[in-house]
From Swiss-Prot:
Region span, FAD-dependent cmnm(5)s(2)U34 oxidoreductase: 259-652
Protein name (database record): tRNA 5-methylaminomethyl-2-thiouridine biosynthesis bifunctional protein MnmC
Catalytic activity: 5-aminomethyl-2-thiouridine(34) in tRNA + S-adenosyl-L-methionine = 5-methylaminomethyl-2-thiouridine(34) in tRNA + S-adenosyl-L-homocysteine + H(+)
Record-stated family: In the N-terminal section; belongs to the methyltransferase superfamily. tRNA (mnm(5)s(2)U34)-methyltransferase family. In the C-terminal section; belongs to the DAO family.
GO biological process: methylation; tRNA wobble base modification
InterPro entries found in the cross-reference section: FAD-dep_OxRdtase, FAD/NAD-bd_sf, MnmC-like_methylTransf, SAM-dependent_MTases_sf, tRNA_MAMT_biosynth_bifunc_MnmC, tRNA_S-uridine_synth_MnmC_C
Region annotation (tRNA (mnm(5)s(2)U34)-methyltransferase) ranges: 1-235
Cofactor needs: FAD
Protein task: Catalyzes the last two steps in the biosynthesis of 5-methylaminomethyl-2-thiouridine (mnm(5)s(2)U) at the wobble position (U34) in tRNA. Catalyzes the FAD-dependent demodification of cmnm(5)s(2)U34 to nm(5)s(2)U34, followed by the transfer of a methyl group from S-adenosyl-L-methionine to nm(5)s(2)U34, to form mnm(5)s(2)U34.
EC number assigned by the record: 2.1.1.61, 1.5.-.-
An annotated Gene Ontology molecular function: flavin adenine dinucleotide binding
Length: 652
């Protein structure tokens, strides 16, 4: 069952004071709230410690109304010696709704130094679903990662190297103990050497747990009469953990080669360019987005299951992350075509609708994420007869993939060099530099990092033996304007129907594994028509001869477990040579091929996974907090099949 998220509540007492069962009485005085937050900044020594750093990461147990984040952001903005990129990771079991957060921080309007930041936070506030939510401010230089869920669980799943901790002291039936021994052990797991902390808790049990896990502890008195602040740093006397927190890949220059200019590759280009990398993008076709990313439109939605399995959590994270990135592109002037009326996923049977209802009830998601429609509601929404109800995703829909790619390349600006009509025959490595080489042996580009985003050809270029991709032929059909009834929004089920801006209806698509024939087939059009006529009776009217219909053939490359391949590629040769020692290995134990990453195997979900995959790779390269929980990072790890072979002693 999923970890159902319960929001904090807010009420106003008779004396006008805002109170919350989860947080008690909320601050009324902006200056006092700011002073309280600034004590935490001073206690962790931030202004001195983030000077000249590329990135600096703060982890907070308990976000509340965001006061400490807003004060930290203001201090960062005011400091000319600040770090280049500030990461703030906050755990919150009971986040406020957007409107309650607006009310809760209303007292900050009087503090002009942070009121603008508060407005930006409220505008970016994410949907109330569990997991990690990444928000960017100040052109991406301030990054807030909100971990919605229980503190102990979320910290154990967090992949980060923390430079400082703000330790809340909220202990209630609603929050549990946010400074339990388990929580403190999880903090020690992600602490960088010398990481500092500050807390208002003076519980001796907390002090003991901190000292037992490698933190020092001392009290700092406050001259203004406030209670003493407990501070310290991570300075273990002996090695206390099996795996060290992630570090940035050491490179002589922030340069990368990305091979493949579809959804996966263009997303990587944009995310690396945003961090100051220079990229050579190599595409074998004359234009970007020429394979599956060249379809007129693609549907975009998350999956939902009652048990909230890996696929559900991954697609939810990808869906929300893509929405945030696309809004950022549009705000920066790089708009592209996408529908804005939501999307309906119709059930294929009564049993299928029951499964949808169970998944909907289990997650308890808000209506801005998903709504359940019975048959009558679905019929009214679509103004068409339907056999069953389904799920309405108000922010789902259809997107023009090539437009997304073009927007991402435009956002990268001068940091990307495109080599179109260029095919990479092989990769060569000389010390710390990768070279992309053509069939004649000429060097096309060189860099310390290569990201393979070229779908089916990635396995060949990387020489992988333990990642298998399968091509799946997909033929879509275009129905001419006037041949169908109006369809208010994209609709999917067994097949899909997408209204395009010019009145054309896009329907599809066939699913033909191991078929690599690019020829358009009449039988494919017939199959697509039959599916959509069953899905939406009454949608399709009289048609011209099927042989005259237009369409497109493209190929999705899928992995056996239907989960993408994202992250650093394993050094398979070294792993095989040490197979016996690695038979019980975890993903973090496996040797990696330095500087070689993969972003492929996206199948039919490139729109959902591409932006998230790009952010994951960029974060891994930079040693930043990852945008996914550990279990999900492991699920997309390119080495997962090698790990299974090692554990099954199929190697060696």
């Amino acid at each position: 069952m999923p970890d159902r998220l319960v929001p904090a509540t807010l009420a106003r007492r008779d004396d006008g004071i805002l109170v919350s069962p989860e947080y008690g009485e909320l601050p009324r005085d902006a200056s006092r709230a700011r002073a309280h937050a600034n004590r935490m900044l001073a206690g962790t020594g931030l202004l001195a410690r983030w000077q000249g750093r590329r990135t600096f990461t703060i982890v907070e147990t308990g976000f509340g109304t965001g006061g400490r984040f807003l004060a930290t952001w203001a201090a960062w903005r005011d400091d000319p010696a600040r770090c280049e990129r500030l990461h703030f990771v906050a755990i919150e079991a009971h986040p406020f709704t957007r409107e309650d957060l607006r009310r809760a921080v209303s007292h900050l309007v009087a503090d002009t130094t942070i009121s603008e930041n508060a407005d930006a936070l409220i505008d970016a506030w994410p949907m109330h679903v569990p997991g990690l939510h990444r928000l960017e401010f100040d052109a991406g230089r301030v990054v807030l990662t909100l971990a919605f869920g229980d503190a102990r669980d979320m910290l154990q799943r967090l992949v980060a190297r923390a430079d400082a901790f703000y330790l809340g002291n909220v202990a209630s039936a609603a929050h549990g103990d946010v400074l339990s021994a388990d929580v403190i052990r999880a903090l020690a797991r992600i602490a960088a050497d010398g990481a500092t902390y500050a807390t208002h808790s003076h519980d001796d049990t907390v002090k003991h747990a901190l000292e037992q896990t490698g933190f020092t502890s001392r009290d700092v008195e406050d001259c203004a009469g406030e209670p003493a602040l407990r501070v310290g740093e991570y300075a273990p006397r002996w090695r206390m953990r099996r795996h060290e927190p992630p570090r940035a890949l050491p490179v002589a220059a922030r340069e990368a080669i990305v091979i493949g200019a579809g959804l996966a590759g263009c997303a990587v280009v944009e995310r690396l360019a945003a961090r100051g990398w220079n990229i050579t993008l190599i595409e074998r076709h004359e234009r970007i987005a020429s394979e599956a990313s060249g379809n007129p439109a693609g549907v975009f939605h998350p999956l939902m299951t009652r048990d909230d399995n890996v696929a559900s959590r991954l697609t939810r994270s990808g869906f929300l992350h893509a929405l945030a990135r696309w809004r950022a592109l549009e705000d920066a002037g790089h708009a592209f075509a996408r529908s804005t009326r939501g999307m309906i996923h119709l059930a294929e049977s009564a049993d299928d609708f029951a499964r949808m209802r169970d998944a909907f009830d289990a997650l308890g998601a808000p209506s801005d994420y998903v709504s359940l429609l019975d048959t009558d509601a679905a019929r009214a929404h679509l103004n068409l007869p339907v056999a069953h109800g389904g799920l309405l995703f108000p922010h789902g829909g259809a997107v023009w993939p090539a437009g997304v790619c073009a927007a991402q390349i435009a956002a990268a600006g001068e940091r990307v060099t495109l080599l179109a009509g260029t095919e990479v025959a092989r990769l060569e490595r000389d010390r710390d530099i990768w070279r992309a080489v053509d069939a004649a042996g000429a060097t096309l580009a060189e860099a310390p990092v290569v990201v393979l985003a070229n779908a089916g050809d990635a396995v060949r270029l990387a020489g992988l033996r333990h990642v298998a991709l399968q091509p799946v032929r997909g033929q879509l059909t275009l129905l001419p304007p006037g041949s169908t009834a109006p369809l208010p929004c994209p609709t999917i089920g067994d097949g899909y129907a997408v209204p395009l801006d010019d009145g054309t209806l896009l329907i599809g698509a066939t699913f033909e594994p191991d078929d690599v024939d690019r020829t358009m087939r009449t039988v494919g059009h017939i199959e697509n028509l039959a599916r959509v006529r069953h899905l939406l009776p009454g949608l399709i009217g009289e048609l011209p001869d099927v042989d005259t219909l237009r369409g497109r053939v493209a190929f999705r490359w899928v992995v056996a477990d239907r989960v993408p391949v994202i992250g650093p590629l394993a050094d398979e040769a070294q792993a095989v040579a040490n197979a016996r020692a690695l038979s019980g290995a975890k993903a973090r134990d496996l040797p990696r091929t330095a500087g070689l990453y993969g972003a492929f195997g996206y199948g039919s979900r490139g729109l959902v996974w591409a932006a998230l995959g790009a952010e994951l790779i960029a974060s891994q390269l930079e040693g930043e907090p990852l945008p996914l929980e550990r279990e999900l990072v492991d699920a997309v790890d390119p080495a997962r099949f090698l790990i299974r072979a090692l554990r099954g002693r199929q190697i060696g």
